[in-house]
């Protein structure tokens, strides 16, 4: 009998934000897998590290991701990972894939899901997303009353960003990173800099909350977000 593939949402960074269900499945799974940069440590692995010390030894599969936007190098990585994890599942071993935030909110797990769901039993365990975490640490509700919340990936080109932001009521700009200067420029053109809130590494020890004008464009990490409320504090 084949094992089950679990996509575990492990939250935005604070280990205490892992759900009870995700923790139970993590502790039970003999195999865990997680994304990591080509060089360096895995954020996902570091989030769950407090729960792995002292327990039964697990097989760990590190999925090294290239830092490029092109689709095909990443596709090859997911192909190889699906094959390796499939071997464990076919041998009857459950596999828990660790996903920062929520697996199905821009999560890398969806690419394994697309490759493996037709062959194996898959269970997706939702997690605390970066959206809700950033709103909480900023003390700024995502949306109020009948406001429409728009999620905008910062890698969009400048014209697309401007079009998405121009008429939006409440906006979360995600994956800011090296696109900060472009995003700042668009917000300035739309007169929204004063209504924007910036946070990086929300809920982590390295968390920082800054005004947009205080942010150095050269040092913005991938895990950063800008929340914008066109109507100001619509919840007051």
Language-model segments: which ranges?
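Short, solvent-exposed amphipathic alpha-helical segments in soluble enzyme
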Residues: 22-25, 49-52, 112-115, 139, ...
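Glycine/small-residue-rich loop that forms an oxyanion/phosphate-binding "nest" at active or ligand-binding sites
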Residues: 61-93, 97
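Short acidic active-site motifs
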Residues: 21, 84, 157-161
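General beta-strand structural signal in soluble alpha/beta enzymes
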Residues: 34, 62, 97-99, 124-127, ...
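Glycine-rich, flexible N-terminal cofactor/catalytic loop recognition
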Residues: 1-63, 163-167, 215-216
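Short, well-ordered alpha-helix to beta-strand connector turns
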Residues: 26-30, 92, 120, 168, ...
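Class I SAM-dependent methyltransferase SAM-binding "motif I" and its flanking Rossmann-like core
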Residues: 101-167, 217, 230-234
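A contiguous loop/helix-start segment that scaffolds small-molecule binding in enzyme catalytic cores
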Residues: 5, 165-236
